[in-house]
């Protein structure tokens, strides 16, 4: 893995007591909190994973948690809209692995909003995207803002990958590309009911080396004015990740894409789900994935920079390397392949 500048992103080993930089809620009365979780799950006809995520956010106040659940469109949609059935995998079929079991194993994932909606130099930019993907050679690739026009360079990656599109033929869509050694069992697409921007949640279920893997790619609602829709979508995604993990003990899960999130919009994260950039050490050199100070493909944003693109993961890896790709300007058109940098994370067990 190589960085695009002279500063090599840090590689940080994750100790057992190291959690996300956002912090961990400590529970003083475990029995009392467990009782609240059971009561919440019984009243709402949900589960204790959902109960824990809401109760943690409101300081374990059961009444406030119930008010949040029944008063929020996000949770009503999660409860009422049967957007997806449960996983076909039986609970307990997958043995729970440790870092010691995986010693020497490495898996890489790249996520990139390739800005297909911008028609300027699109054919050239898509060729550059394909060239960079081949150079970095990730095992898994999440793409957002894919369009039918000038798609040929992406389609040609099928010589290296199995390609799954969310809703090809739509104005724009997402794609998941997996290496040929990845055995795909199922591909699902969930259309967000509250989206006015054709946004979806794309899920590929399969295995690699006998290990159960779930790949979850999304492009959440854009722009500050659509904060409520975006937060509801993110909450749904995290609930779905928690459900997958609960139904498939010992699985590997990777969730990411262009989340368009501001830090203050992040709701609770399920236990055991980590942010790859945080796991790699929170290096400020790799923080900003949409950086209009360094990337001038988009004008008029006065140097705004955001960490819109993120990867979350679940599994027994104990080392994460995180880098940004696509930061070289294309000589022929003097622009970058996209207004977003690609994020690339390599997970390993040492």
Curated annotation (Swiss-Prot):
**InterPro entries annotated for this entry?**
Endo/exonu/phosph_ase_sf (IPR036691), Endo/exonuclease/phosphatase (IPR005135), TDP2-like (IPR051547), UBA-like_sf (IPR009060), UBA_8 (IPR054109)
Q: Which residues bind Mg(2+)?
A: 115, 145
The coenzyme or cofactor needed here is:
Mg(2+); Mn(2+)
- Keyword field: DNA damage, DNA repair, Hydrolase, Magnesium, Metal-binding, Nuclease, Nucleus
* Cellular component terms per the entry's GO annotation: cytoplasm; PML body
Active site location: 258 (proton donor/acceptor)
Gene Ontology BP term (one) = double-strand break repair
Location of the protein in the cell: Nucleus; Nucleus, PML body
Q: How is the cofactor bound?
A: Binds 1 magnesium or manganese ion per subunit.
Leader sequence range is: none
Q: Which GO MF terms does the UniProt record name?
A: 5'-tyrosyl-DNA phosphodiesterase activity; metal ion binding; nuclease activity; single-stranded DNA binding
Q: Where is this site: Interaction with 5' end of substrate DNA?
A: 172, 290, 308, 340
Q: Where is this region: Interaction with 5' end of substrate DNA?
A: 113-117, 219-224, 260-262
The record's Pfam families line, in alphabetical order, gives: Exo_endo_phos, UBA_8
First-listed, main subcellular location of the protein, grouped into a coarse class: nucleus
Q: What EC number(s) does this enzyme carry?
A: 3.1.4.-
Described purpose of this protein according to its UniProt entry: DNA repair enzyme that can remove a variety of covalent adducts from DNA through hydrolysis of a 5'-phosphodiester bond, giving rise to DNA with a free 5' phosphate. Catalyzes the hydrolysis of dead-end complexes between DNA and the topoisomerase 2 (top2) active site tyrosine residue. Hydrolyzes 5'-phosphoglycolates on protruding 5' ends on DNA double-strand breaks (DSBs) due to DNA damage by radiation and free radicals.
Q: Which family does it belong to?
A: Belongs to the CCR4/nocturin family. TTRAP/TDP2 subfamily.
Full protein name: 5'-tyrosyl-DNA phosphodiesterase
- Specify the species: Caenorhabditis briggsae
């Amino acid at each position: 893995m190589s960085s695009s500048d002279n500063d090599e992103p840090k590689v940080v080993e994750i100790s057992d007591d190291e959690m996300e930089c956002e912090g961990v809620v400590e529970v003083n009365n475990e029995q009392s909190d467990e009782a609240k979780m059971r009561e919440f799950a019984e009243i709402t006809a949900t589960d204790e994973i959902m109960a824990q995520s809401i109760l943690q956010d409101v300081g374990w106040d059961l009444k406030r948690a119930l008010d949040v659940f029944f008063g929020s469109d996000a949770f009503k949609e999660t409860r009422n809209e049967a957007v997806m059935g449960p996983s076909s995998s039986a609970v307990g079929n997958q043995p729970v692995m440790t870092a010691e079991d995986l010693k020497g194993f490495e898996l890489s994932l790249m996520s990139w909003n390739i800005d297909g909606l911008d028609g300027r130099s699109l054919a050239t930019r898509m060729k550059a995207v394909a060239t960079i993907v081949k150079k970095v050679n990730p095992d898994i690739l999440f793409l957002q803002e894919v369009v039918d026009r000038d798609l040929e360079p992406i389609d040609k990656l099928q010589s290296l990958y199995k390609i799954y599109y969310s809703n090809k033929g739509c104005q724009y869509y997402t794609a998941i590309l997996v290496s040929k050694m990845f055995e795909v069992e199922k591909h699902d697409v969930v259309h967000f009911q509250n989206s006015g921007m054709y946004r979806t949640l794309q899920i590929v279920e399969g295995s690699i080396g006998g290990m159960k893997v779930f790949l979850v790619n999304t492009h959440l609602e854009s722009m500050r004015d659509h904060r409520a829709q975006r937060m509801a979508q993110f909450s749904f995604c995290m609930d779905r990740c928690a459900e997958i993990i609960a139904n498939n003990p010992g699985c590997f899960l990777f969730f990411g894409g262009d989340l368009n999130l501001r830090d203050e919009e992040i709701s609770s994260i399920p236990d055991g789900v980590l942010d790859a950039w945080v796991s790699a050490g929170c290096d400020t050199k790799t923080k900003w994935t949409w950086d209009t100070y360094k990337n001038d493909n988009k004008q008029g944003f006065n140097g705004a920079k955001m960490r819109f693109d993120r990867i979350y993961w679940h599994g027994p890896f104990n080392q994460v390397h995180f880098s940004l790709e696509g930061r070289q300007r294309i000589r022929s058109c003097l622009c970058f392949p996209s207004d977003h940098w690609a994020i690339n994370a390599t997970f390993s067990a040492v």
